[in-house]
Amino acid sequence: MSKKETLWDIAVIGGGASGMMAAITAARTGKTVVLIEHKDQLGKKILATGNGKCNFTNSEMIPEAFRGDQNLFHSIYKQFDRDNTLSFFHEIGVLPKCRKGYYYPASEQALSIQKALEMELTNLGVTIMTGCVPDRIQKADSLKGYLITGAKLDIPAKKVIIATGLLASPNSGSDGSFIPVIKNLGHHFTPVVPALCGFETSGYNPKSAAGVRFEGTVSLFIDHVLVASDRGEIQFTEYGISGIPVFQISRYASVALYEKKQVEAVIDLFPSLSTEELALELKNRFYRPSRYRRNYMQIFNGLLNQKLTACLCEYCGFIPEQKPKEEQYPDAIRVLKDAIKGFRITLTKPRSFEYAQIACGGVRSDEINPGSLESRLWPGIYFSGELLDVDGICGGYNLQWAWSSGYAAGLHASRQIEEEKS
């Protein structure tokens, strides 16, 4: 498909959340916009968010929910914040529904978000090109803009917005295939690693409790220093550990592993009891009349999941079916208490990008104007979304960044065209 006869005001490369927002914002200013997506459908990654329900923003926009370049985040977020996001989606037909601070479409279908964006693009006259793979951007001085080329692709545009994502969830389109094109422009990247993901472990592997989910607290230690912690539903797996609390601290762990540092997760298997309360509970369970003498599995019945109990015994060097003798009780209580409150696992590797919800890292912020997201190397080229060195924890924060950065890139690219006319 050739669009060489048309000089577009703005070409957006990448039809995900941020790219669609950038295209809509630019088109609303009256600019001619073409949106280029190498997959056969726009917004494929949106469809998988929030377990198919699409948690698209959050009521609590706390600074600590965002990692990476905090200054860049604040500069962009104030231009299009949570309230702007809620108003925007309501305007295009998505009634927001809040549950425990998490905003979803009232339909509780991610498809509602994707379709609403797609319909708005169509209503605004944005040209959508799917199945197109651009592989080069070059300056076209005669056009006072850029030429985007690829197989059967030849698109001239005054401004270019790149919203291709990084490497997370490659099947949805974020496969990293455009990163070499960006590097060929002279841009550099901070380390790109998986985030919002589980981790493989070494040493003791809790795979004997694979599939077990439990309320716990995970504390992350990097080179023996506590860096972050989070509480919620943790899951032991065949490969190591997973669950939302693990996802929330994953950025720090992934970056530290990339830097070859020692990374450990210390898990409190029973955070609802203090150390003293747990010691008393264990003492009461061990010290029963002799006729109640039981093995470890029986002692923990009703306290911990059975598979988790077997895993705990294995970790402590006890045989689950063995009945401890009374003289062994004090040591057993101490060892088990310490293990429950401090189950230590060495993390060796994040799960691959295929299993990561996002990637952290991105184009270096010192190569980008923090107010407009315009390249400092190539005026007229803008970046948005996951490509930038900002990422969030679970809870709608990464989609909020997509909306905010897409809006900013689309707005400033449009304004620049207006300024060049005057």
Model regions: which residues?
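Beta1/beta-strand and adjacent pyrophosphate-binding region of the FAD-binding site
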Residues: 4-18
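Core beta-strand elements of the Rossmann-like FAD/NAD(P) dinucleotide-binding domain
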Residues: 6-8, 150-159, 229-231
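Glycine-rich FAD pyrophosphate-binding loop
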Residues: 11, 27-51
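Short hydrophobic core segments
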Residues: 11-13, 134, 155-171, 182, ...
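An anion/pyrophosphate-binding glycine-rich loop and adjacent beta-alpha core
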Residues: 40-42, 47-48, 56-60, 95, ...
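Glycine-rich active-site loop/strand segments that organize a redox cofactor
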Residues: 51-100
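A glycine-rich dinucleotide-binding beta-alpha-beta segment and adjacent secondary-structure elements
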Residues: 130, 309-391
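A conserved short coil-to-beta-strand element within the FAD-binding core of flavoproteins
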Residues: 130-144
